[in-house]
A protein has these predicted regions:
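Intrinsically disordered, low-complexity boundary segments flanking structured domains
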Residues: 6, 55, 136, 158-159, ...
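Intrinsically disordered, low-complexity regulatory regions
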Residues: 199-446
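Basic, glycine-/proline-tolerant helical and adjacent loop/strand elements
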Residues: 65-207
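N-terminal alpha-helical interaction blocks
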Residues: 1-109, 175, 179-191, 234-237, ...
Length: 477
């Protein structure tokens, strides 16, 4: 095998993430440039870190890295409850995990990941989310494990360096952009080194992998690029996997927001609204991470959409938005719909119809509450539009009224009608506030307004301190 082809990159998300972690640890731009000498050096780093974590006292920060290993490799030599706590005795067992394949000694099998010749078979204790050695019905016929070549074995144990890890789970990235994949791995290698030195107590409690992905995408590309996050725990009794994805146009949306002050203002308003504090004033949910999560759609459908969250903010009467704030949030919603969903919307005539009807009523607040209740329901909205259209006609409206032909995209049960109705509400709320119709129960706080204006001058998708981590060099291990 040539010097620059010692490590393959496959389509398997865990092996792929591990291969990029190996490249980051070796200081290479991509896994294709990893040499046999690099594999040796990375193997030595992994062995040293595993042994140190597995033999560390429970009250030390090093033990936090053992928790990571336990979540990924239960019952391995490094995590078994009956393991030795003598580093000298444990080291040979860990080194043996990454021993050279010796095809001359017997039968060779194609590696499960890259199809290279392999003489070692592994099962769940060493491979996250794979079957145990007892599940012979799911394993290759007559083989008590999955064949794994040396390069892929090292990659699978370098995985936690390139993943976003917690004490109980790991998150890896699959991405069409190699630049984003490399950036994600490098940031997480730095973070992993910090966990080993300071433990999880030394890390921001509200940080999330989605924030790191958005920062990587922002720096990598402005074109089309799909990303997938795989979050999992390789538990003995109840392993689980959660998959979330971004749409391919999200990088274009990020670039548009980052280059536009009103959109940055809208994003920072969204972040601030999602920040949560406990009774002592400590942050328990970071707004940056929670906002980033809205751009990821769960495979099982259990995720909050960005447009839905923006609608809740604009419809909540307890929130005090200035005209500028409301315009920024509405513009953010329209930009997302246009950039990510490819929606072309001209809702101003219908929005004007509803705003006129609300404003000209004897109780604008009452009519607004009526519209708020009907806004997302196709049937209720259709009924309200008929009512508004008829009332304004009877009152002798001097402006042209949007007729039923313009209502169709909003009240039919068709693709993107729900999103259209949310955007309509956003535009109606902006028109009402521009006209001075009271919407919220509170007035906007001038101090908060100044803070948001200052935030709007900053990048929207910064790495939130990840770039401040010192670069890790293998010589420090």
């Amino acid at each position: 095998m040539g010097e620059v082809s010692a490590l393959a990159v496959t389509g398997h998300p865990l092996q792929r993430a591990g291969a990029w972690a190996v490249a980051a640890l070796a200081g290479r731009d991509d896994p294709g440039r990893v040499s046999e000498a690099d594999l040796e050096a990375v193997s030595a780093v992994v062995v040293a870190d595993v042994v140190a974590a597995a033999t560390a006292p429970k009250d030390t920060s090093r033990y936090d890295w053992w928790k990571v290993l336990f979540a990924l490799y239960p019952n391995s030599k490094a995590t078994h409850s009956k393991r030795t706590f003598d580093p000298a005795a444990l080291r040979p067992d860990i080194e043996n995990l990454f021993a050279q394949d010796r095809p001359e000694d017997g039968r060779t099998l194609p590696c499960t990941f890259c199809s290279a010749k392999a003489t070692v078979v592994w099962a769940k204790s060493n491979l996250p989310l794979f079957d145990t050695s007892k599940a012979l019905n799911a394993l290759p016929p007559g083989i008590a494990g999955w064949p794994v070549c040396r390069g892929c074995r090292i990659a699978m144990w370098a995985l936690p360096y390139g993943a976003w890890v917690t004490a109980g789970s790991a998150t890896v990235l699959s991405c069409e952009s190699e630049t984003a994949q490399r950036d994600f791995a490098r940031r997480n290698v730095r973070r992993a080194r910090r966990v080993m030195h300071a433990g999880f107590t030394g890390m921001p409690a509200t940080a999330r992998p989605e924030t790191v992905v958005l920062a990587a995408l922002r720096d990598a590309t402005e074109g089309l690029c799909a990303t997938t996050l795989w979050t999992f725990k390789n538990d003995n009794q109840d392993p689980w996997l959660r998959v979330t994805r971004t749409r391919r146009a999200v990088p274009a949306f990020l670039a548009t927001v980052d280059g536009n002050a009103p959109l940055r203002r809208g994003w920072h308003l969204l972040r601030r609204s999602l920040t949560r504090y406990d009774a002592q004033g400590r942050t328990v949910a970071g707004g940056a991470g929670e906002a980033a999560r809205l751009l990821f759609e769960a495979e099982d459908g259990r995720s909050r959409p960005l447009l839905g969250q923006l609608h809740r903010l604009l419809a909540d009467t307890d929130d005090a938005w200035s005209v500028g704030d409301r315009e920024a949030l509405a513009r953010l919603a329209f930009t997302y719909a246009e950039e990510v969903f490819g929606m072309e919307t001209d809702l101003e005539p219908v929005a004007t119809l509803i705003a006129d009807w609300i404003e000209q009523g004897t109780s604008p607040r009452g009519r607004l509450a009526e519209y708020r209740n009907a806004a997302l329901n196709d049937y209720k909205l259709g009924t309200l539009l008929i009512q508004a259209y008829t009332r304004l006609q009877l009152d002798g409206s001097k402006t042209p009224l949007a007729g039923p032909e313009l209502w169709k995209p909003l009240i039919r049960r068709q693709s993107r009608a729900w999103e259209q109705r949310m955007l309509l509400f956003a535009q109606v709320s902006v028109l009402l506030q521009q006209r001075g119709v009271p919407i919220g129960a509170k007035e906007a706080d001038p101090q908060q307004e100044r803070e948001i204006e200052a935030l709007a001058e900053r990048p929207a998708f910064a790495g939130d301190g990840e770039d401040e981590y010192d670069d890790y060099e293998m010589g420090q291990a």
